[in-house]
């Protein structure tokens, strides 16, 4: 009797595993995860949006499982027993059941969404590198990149300040000459009408003219310096927006390509008459190496720095 129960549990586990590897499950689940994972990050704070998306995911999982279990005649008790059996505790089975467990456990769900978001970003970056040969500066990792960005920004700032100083000096010289010319023009009527007061008039004219050479218009110098800096901030903000838009386009295109590939693979599988469970072999996801984790951390630090620059500006 015990052997029969074990055989029944084993059959239920294998049936569920076959369904979870098949297109009826994997296509809608993968589409949902890829479309919704963009807003997930590894911050400790759980946003309200996360909860709403998790509820949508839970409803999708329940609908798919309920339909399948009715088709093959497995009741809820059998399903629960199969999920808690030793056969479902292996690493292979846990990897297969992760999307199901994520519907009940928000922590598992969030980790799954963060992992998929990271995977999508890395795939988009690889596509950019393959097509362009090199990565944009904002997508290369490491502290050296941040340093390069800062150095480039300093070069731009110095150049802007240099040009600003030249323009300021030219403007000051032009105003000085204009004021000298106006001062001389005012002296002529005074010389014609009062010859006796010529020396005094000239003294007044010189007194008026000389300070003009060092005339400082309040706020002008400050405004001249702030203008280029403001332009620089606008330039950097616009550049960041363009980069973000560029990466989003690549991401959307990648999702479209992946969806088309899945549809074609599904059609090919149906034409050959093979069950999806036989076509797809379950593979365990390799854990990230320390180097990959370090690379990911550096990329996230850079992304946060760029995000702060955009928000602050």
UniProtKB/Swiss-Prot annotation:
Residue ranges that the Swiss-Prot or TrEMBL entry lists as coiled coil: 147-187
GO cellular component: axoneme; ciliary base; motile cilium; nucleus
Residue ranges of the region described as Disordered: 165-204, 262-292
Post-translational modification Phosphoserine, affected residues: 85, 147, 201
Biased composition (Basic and acidic residues): 179-189, 271-292
Subcellular location: Nucleus; Cytoplasm; Cell projection, Cilium, Flagellum
One Pfam family matching this protein: ARL2_Bind_BART
Highest taxon in the source lineage: Eukaryota
InterPro entries in UniProt: BART_dom (IPR023379), BART_sf (IPR042541), CFAP36 (IPR038888)
The keyword Nucleotide-binding belongs to this UniProt entry's keyword annotation: no
Keywords: Cell projection, Cilium, Coiled coil, Cytoplasm, Flagellum, Nucleus, Phosphoprotein
UniProt feature, compositional bias: Polar residues: 192-203
Keyword Coiled coil: yes
Similarity-based family: Belongs to the CFAP36 family.
Assembly and binders: Interacts with ARL3.
Function: May act as an effector for ARL3.
Protein name: Cilia- and flagella-associated protein 36
Lineage: Eukaryota, Metazoa, Chordata, Craniata, Vertebrata
Gene behind this protein: CFAP36
